[in-house]
Amino acid sequence: MIREMSNHDIKLEVCVDSIRSAFAAEEGGASRIELCSALGEGGLTPSIGTLKTIKETLTMPIYCMLRPRRGTDFVYSDEEMCALLTDMDLLRENGADGFVFGSLNPDRSINVDQCRHVLLASGGLPVTFHRAFDLTDQKSMDENVDMLRELGFRRLLSSGFRPTAADGVDCLAQLIAKHQRDFIVMPGAGIKVSNLEEILTVSRCLEFHASALDTAGEDYVAPTTTRMECDVTMGKQDVDPYYGTNSIVVRKMVTIAKAMSSR
């Protein structure tokens, strides 16, 4: 039986990796920002300077990603955890409103000890467990959600064990129906204006996560300096289009979410 959606505003968390994208997220009406760096790598820990600059202007909550390097194993050494916890302390001292973290063992089970260290270091700020969850054993998903809640995580970001939330929406609906009373399961990955209504309808989520990207972003102004045509690049991203959060895309998503909230 599908649970009826209660009368509430469905919240949009926008994932950003730049100051300009953060401003676009707020302009579009997002409820919260997940701040990271290197979104093209799946999102890494942001810089203190970026957080401080955004906090000086924006009033919306900012959750900071805690991820010391690229890679989808999410198996961290003691040294990597030491660096991560140091970053966490500095981010908290400079205004972070929450954190996003995930850690696994080599067998892809959740690394409970490392999770406890992060939750203890959070100082009571909310912590989201990210899509590392989607690499765990799907057969144990309910037990793992219960464990995350008992550890102290406030929410889970998941694509339902599939590449995108649209692909995994049926699994997400199951998780949400079972755990939403005391834990937030937040769909994310590949959510677009074109598939948002279906994802909200099927999943019955209270929150969702998107980057609302557009090539160069809505208000991007190209540098006035002339870029010489040459073969020198600073990395793969230099040869790809520059993507940023588009406030118009955010606004469209918020409008859809509000319409769905009133149903």
Curated annotation (Swiss-Prot):
Q: Which Pfam families match?
A: CutC (PF03932)
Its keywords, alphabetically, are: Copper
The molecular function terms in GO held by this entry are:
copper ion binding
N-terminal signal peptide: none
Q: Show the HAMAP family listed in the entry.
A: CutC
Similarity comment: Belongs to the CutC family.
Instruction: Outline what the protein does.
Output: Involved in copper homeostasis.
The name this protein goes by in its record: Copper homeostasis protein cutC homolog
Q: Which organism is it from?
A: Drosophila melanogaster (Fruit fly)
**What does the record give as the organism's lineage?**
Eukaryota, Metazoa, Ecdysozoa, Arthropoda, Hexapoda
